[in-house]
Regions:
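A short, structured beta-strand/loop element
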Residues: 21-60
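C-terminal structural segments of small proteins and small subunits
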Residues: 55-76
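Generic secondary-structure boundary/loop-capping signal
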Residues: 15-16, 34, 71
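Residue-level signal for pocket-adjacent positions within structured domains
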Residues: 13, 50-52, 69
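Short helix-coil boundary/hinge micro-motifs
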Residues: 2-15, 19, 75
Length: 76
């Protein structure tokens, strides 16, 4: 069972390195940031609200998301 929950304030995930796309540019814009938790889970937050809620995914969930994105499952 995870010690993290969805909607946890990102400020409670102290000491993490948050990553975002290099394509986001210097102003940040509407970017998603991710961080890898010591438990192996992956946290995601909105760069415009870095202290706001974070979504937490298991590694298999994250891998499935990346696979779907790479396969075009989310394309319009």
């Amino acid at each position: 069972m995870s010690m993290y929950r969805n909607g946890i304030p990102a400020t409670e995930l102290a000491g993490l390195t948050w990553l975002k796309s290099q394509r986001s540019g210097p102003t940040g814009g509407n970017c998603v940031e991710v961080a890898f938790l010591p438990s192996g889970e992956v946290a995601m937050r909105n760069s415009r609200d870095p202290g706001g809620p974070a979504l937490v995914f298991t590694r298999p969930e994250w891998d499935a998301f990346l696979g779907g994105a790479g396969d075009g499952e989310f394309s319009c």
